[in-house]
Amino acid sequence: MTTRRLMLVHAHPDDESLTTGGTIARYAAEGADVQLVTCTLGEEGEVIGDRWAQLAVDQADQLGGYRIGELSTALRHLGVDGPTFLGGAGRWRDSGMADTTPLHPRAFAGADLNEAVGALTALIDEHRPHVVVTYDPFGGYGHPDHIQAHTVTTAAVEKASWQVAKLYWTVIATSALETGLASITQLPPGCQPAPLDLIPTFADEKISAAIDVSGHREAKVAALRAHATQLTVSDDGSSMALSNLIALPIADIEHFVLVRGEPGVDTGWESDLFAGVEL
């Protein structure tokens, strides 16, 4: 039987665990070949707490190297080898948010598209994934690197000699966020639940797939905890927050929108990203 192959393209260390950690853990545990491609080292991230605060970009500027270690630990919890960085570790730099200082010369948001697309195309042709996952055109919440990851991934899937059967966007379903916020039993210290209107979501009718990752919750929570410079997880593992102290639920179901390929079900949501794929 042919091994199922999944590739996920994320912008920074921690993104893989935030939106797709359960999916990664589930398919890895099921024996699929799961490849994570991370586009930057996350050098511009806001550091939580005092212990590693001086690694930040405005001080020692050593955060990117430290986050390689965090990502490596997270991937071990999720059962995946790695990490793999687009163009090699350090080729492209975290661009920061759109309203921050001018772009660094190596910022991923300003990357030469021919080079970036070529680098990802080569990885697609090497690993031959049946399914690829990345962000929607808005990058989930508008981060320039997420938007660039969407652009690069979409172009690379089209350019690759290997024909990717299905391309998905990782998204948050509106109803799932509502249910998840209501189910939070503990908040990280000093945090408040996210207002519904603050988090970009996709209406349920736009969702294509809902992946049940409840059986891999422990791995997902452990992976999130590994990104300790960026995330705070509640003691009971029901919620997490970035440096903005806005808490989100840690979901048992992860949602996706299919944008290339045919759905594996005639009606309703898929429960398997590989549904309908001929292996």
Curated annotation (Swiss-Prot):
It is an enzyme of class 3 (hydrolase). Keywords: Hydrolase, Metal-binding, Zinc. Zn(2+) binds at H12, D15, H146. Gene3D superfamilies: LmbE-like. GO terms for biological process: mycothiol biosynthetic process. Binds 1 zinc ion per subunit. InterPro entries: GlcNAc_PI_deacetylase-related, LmbE-like_dom_sf, Mycothiol_biosynthesis_MshB. Its EC number is 3.5.1.103. The keyword Zinc applies. It catalyses: 1D-myo-inositol 2-acetamido-2-deoxy-alpha-D-glucopyranoside + H2O = 1D-myo-inositol 2-amino-2-deoxy-alpha-D-glucopyranoside + acetate. Its cofactor is Zn(2+). SUPFAM superfamilies: LmbE-like (SSF102588). GO terms for molecular function: N-acetylglucosaminylinositol deacetylase activity; zinc ion binding. The keyword Cell wall biogenesis/degradation does not apply. NCBIfam families: mycothiol_MshB. Catalyzes the deacetylation of 1D-myo-inositol 2-acetamido-2-deoxy-alpha-D-glucopyranoside (GlcNAc-Ins) in the mycothiol biosynthesis pathway. Belongs to the MshB deacetylase family. HAMAP family: MshB. This is 1D-myo-inositol 2-acetamido-2-deoxy-alpha-D-glucopyranoside deacetylase. It comes from Mycobacteroides abscessus (strain ATCC 19977 / DSM 44196 / CCUG 20993 / CIP 104536 / JCM 13569 / NCTC 13031 / TMC 1543 / L948) (Mycobacterium abscessus). The gene is mshB.
